[in-house]
């Protein structure tokens, strides 16, 4: 098992963890319905890039 030889200072510890924060998912707005959805995913109504691609229960 690896064991560090010297204690890592708080500054170095912070630098090591600087990219561990959470980011928000990029969202897109469907132009035909105005719904918000994840990028490169279909909207809940079944639209993708302004075209109906999947039939939903409401249709």
Swiss-Prot record:
Q: What is this protein called?
A: Large ribosomal subunit protein bL32
Keyword Ribosomal protein in annotation: yes
Q: Which SUPFAM superfamilies match?
A: Zn-binding ribosomal proteins (SSF57829)
Keyword set, alphabetical order: Ribonucleoprotein, Ribosomal protein
**Looking at the keywords, is Phosphoprotein present?**
no
Q: Which organism is it from?
A: Burkholderia mallei (strain ATCC 23344)
Q: Which HAMAP family match?
A: Ribosomal_bL32
The family annotation for this protein states: Belongs to the bacterial ribosomal protein bL32 family.
